[in-house]
Amino acid sequence: MVAVRVLAAMSGGVDSAVAAARAVAAGHDVTGVHLALARNPQTYRTGARGCCTLEDSRDARRAADVIGIPFYVWDMAERFQADVVDDFVAEYAAGRTPNPCLRCNEKIKFAAVLDRAVALGFDAVVTGHHARLGADGLLRRSVDLAKDQSYVLGVLTREQLGRSMFPLGDSTKTQVRAEATGRGLTVADKPDSHDICFVADGDTRGFLAERLGATPGDVVDSSTGAVVGRHTGAYAYTVGQRRGLHLDRPAPDGRPRYVLSITPKTNTVTVGPAEALAVSQVRAQRPVWTGGPRPADPIECEVQLRAHGDVVPATVAVTGDGLRAELHRPVRGVAAGQAIVAYRPDPGGDVVLGSATIAA
């Protein structure tokens, strides 16, 4: 591998620290950077859950010191607010369910950060994502399928992938932690973050309520058309949700009810039985295709419809600014705003073909 000048995005976690260390071991000229993203005061409390905390910044700096690389903090809060946080709120207000980690990769880590890195003379950005990027430029699943993050990287363009490095793709999380211990990194046993970084303590409903206010409306049963409850904000619900519906009466058939759809125009949440969640066709928009030339005809592949979701065989057609997937078996709980990522099965790791944002 040719040694290049790389910027290591260091979140303060074990993955990004080991990724930076591996880049140094590979002979690259590495500089570490921690992104200051969230300006929610609650994220700066000692012991606050999530990421973007003061502890994370300190952990990233300590890791850089142990590795022996220069370290800086870049303030990306304004860009992050506009492209990720405001987008998150607007999507929920529109009745969709966004994936902010995916949007952050698309707009911040591999756009704003990469653009600044290139302007400063860096050749690539290295991150601790669990995914593989081969010499052929194709993005593949990690060997550790339980930690695979290729889904949230599926939005990246060929140009962005061409300036990215993912050194952890051939390792399991257990191996990464063991290596961190061997390197003397204090984050070796630091727990993974599973929260949305800008939502303090994982309270998404409270976060949205502060910004969108109370907007009471009806909860309607799809089977009868009857109003079976009231809500204080349709933004608090997502397709497939069962808990927290607070219905006024049992369903006529006695079966559990799930959120089937959210209609912002009428401020209505529609609920129904589980089987009504099943869909066999998915429409999506703004496709990004990286696994070779964009197909002129429908192709057979596999698709993933949410992070850590099941993989489903499908026939996918890409036309203009749209993508259509005919699922070979019905899937429940497909939510607008999430990504559909297409994969080609491969013995060397399933290849990401492309992605798009689910519209319906």
Curated annotation (Swiss-Prot):
Amino-acid positions noted as binding ATP in the UniProt annotation, renumbered to this chain: 9-16, 35, 128
Residues flagged as site, Interaction with tRNA: 129, 338
Disulphide bridges: 104-197
GO CC terms in record: cytoplasm
Keyword Transcription regulation recorded: no
Region (Interaction with tRNA): 147-149
Gene3D superfamilies hit by this protein: Adenine nucleotide alpha hydrolases-like domains (2.30.30.280), HUPs (3.40.50.620), Translation factors (2.40.30.10)
Keywords recorded for this protein, A-Z: ATP-binding, Cytoplasm, Disulfide bond, Nucleotide-binding, RNA-binding, Transferase, tRNA processing, tRNA-binding
Broad class of where this protein is predominantly found: cytoplasm
CDD domains registered for this protein in UniProt: MnmA_TRMU-like
InterPro entries according to UniProt: MnmA-like, MnmA-like_C, MnmA-like_central, MnmA-like_central_sf, Rossmann-like_a/b/a_fold
One Pfam family named in its UniProt record: tRNA_Me_trans
Enzyme Commission identifier(s): 2.8.1.13
Domain of life: Bacteria
Active site: 104 (nucleophile), 197 (cysteine persulfide intermediate)
Catalyses which reaction(s): S-sulfanyl-L-cysteinyl-[protein] + uridine(34) in tRNA + AH2 + ATP = 2-thiouridine(34) in tRNA + L-cysteinyl-[protein] + A + AMP + diphosphate + H(+)
A GO molecular-function descriptor: ATP binding
Location of this chain's protein in the cell: Cytoplasm
Stated role: Catalyzes the 2-thiolation of uridine at the wobble position (U34) of tRNA, leading to the formation of s(2)U34.
Name this polypeptide is given: tRNA-specific 2-thiouridylase MnmA
